[in-house]
UniProtKB/Swiss-Prot annotation:
The keyword Transport does not apply. Coiled coil: none annotated. It catalyses: heme b + 3 reduced [NADPH--hemoprotein reductase] + 3 O2 = biliverdin IXalpha + CO + Fe(2+) + 3 oxidized [NADPH--hemoprotein reductase] + 3 H2O + H(+). Disulfide bonds: none annotated. It is found in: Plastid, Chloroplast. Keywords: Chloroplast, Heme, Iron, Metal-binding, Oxidoreductase, Photosynthesis, Plastid. It comes from the Eukaryota. This is Heme oxygenase. InterPro entries: Haem_Oase, Haem_Oase-like, Haem_Oase-like_multi-hlx, Haem_oxygenase_CS. It comes from Rhodella violacea. The gene is pbsA. GO terms for biological process: heme catabolic process; heme oxidation; photosynthesis; response to oxidative stress. Its EC number is 1.14.14.18.
C-alpha cells in the first residue's frame, strides 16, 4: 500500500539514539565546548566537501524522480560554500591539497551505492545532514569563529544558507515535503534504517578526526619534553 506518511516524525524518533551517540563523540564534545584544532577542522571541511559533493551530485541525478523531487532544494547545497572555506584554509590551490579520509571514502561509496540501487535512501542522508546544518549552523559558526579568532565570515561559509531567508520556516516546509512523499511501510523502515547508518558514518569521520587530534597533541608534548631536556633550555 502506498500513501502519505509522517516520515519526518518517524525519522526524528527513529534516530534519537544515534543522534545522541554522535553528539557524544569526543571530537564533537570538544568542538561544542569551544576546543577546535585548526588542522582537524580543515580536514573536517575537506571531508564534508567530498560527502556533500557525492550527495548533491546524486540528488541532482534523481531530481525529477517522484520520490526525490519533493525534497530537492538547490538552496540547501553546500558544495560551493565548502569550496569557499577550503580556499580560506588551504589557499588557492586547495584542490591539490585535500583528500578524503578513509572514513569519508566509506561514506561517499555508500552514497553512490544507494543512488544506483535504492535512490529513495538518499532521503535519509539529506535529512541527517541538511536539517542538522540548519538547526545548529549558527551556534557552530559562533564556536568556530571564537575558537579560531575568525571574523567577517571568513572560514565559516559552510554554515551560511544565503538563499534561505527564514531557516525555521524552511525546516517546517522541508518536513512537510518529507511527509508528502508517497512511500510504502517497508520503504519508510528502510529510510529510517539508512538515517541511522548516516549517523554512524558521520561518527566514524568524527572519531577519525579525534584520533588525529590526539596524535597531534602527543607529538607536540613529545617535542616539548625533548626541548626541555636540551642543555641551556629555559622555560
Amino acid at each position: 500500500m502506498i500513501y502519505d506518511t509522517n516520515l519526518a516524525l518517524q525519522l526524528r524518533q527513529g534516530t534519537t539514539k544515534a543522534h545522541s551517540m554522535a553528539e557524544n563523540v569526543s571530537f564533537v564534545k570538544s568542538f561544542l565546548g569551544g576546543v577546535v584544532d585548526k588542522q582537524a577542522y580543515r580536514q573536517l571541511i575537506a571531508n564534508f566537501y567530498f560527502v556533500y559533493s557525492a550527495i548533491e551530485d546524486e540528488m541532482k541525478r534523481h531530481q525529477e524522480s517522484q520520490i526525490i523531487k519533493p525534497i530537492y532544494f538547490e538552496e540547501l547545497n553546500r558544495k560551493s560554500s565548502l569550496e569557499e572555506d577550503l580556499q580560506f584554509y588551504y589557499g588557492l590551490e586547495w584542490q591539490d591539497k585535500i583528500f578524503p579520509s578513509p572514513a569519508t571514502k566509506v561514506y561517499i561509496n555508500r552514497i553512490h551505492e544507494i543512488s544506483n540501487t535504492s535512490p529513495e535512501l538518499l532521503i535519509a542522508h539529506c535529512y541527517t545532514r541538511y536539517l542538522g546544518d540548519l538547526s545548529g549552523g549558527q551556534i557552530l559558526k559562533k564556536i568556530t569563529q571564537s575558537a579560531m579568532n575568525l571574523s567577517g565570515g571568513e572560514g565559516t561559509a559552510f554554515y551560511e544558507f544565503k538563499d534561505i531567508k527564514d531557516e525555521k520556516n524552511f525546516k517546517q516546509n522541508y518536513r512537510l515535503a518529507l511527509d508528502s512523499i508517497h512511500l510504502s511501510d517497508s520503504a519508510i523502515k528502510s529510510i529510517v534504517s539508512e538515517a541511522n547508518i548516516a549517523f554512524k558514518l558521520n561518527m566514524k569521520i568524527f572519531q577519525e578526526l579525534n584520533s588525529n587530534f590526539i596524535k597531534i597533541i602527543a607529538i607536540f608534548l613529545f617535542n616539548f619534553i625533548k626541548r626541555i631536556k636540551l642543555p641551556g633550555f629555559k622555560s
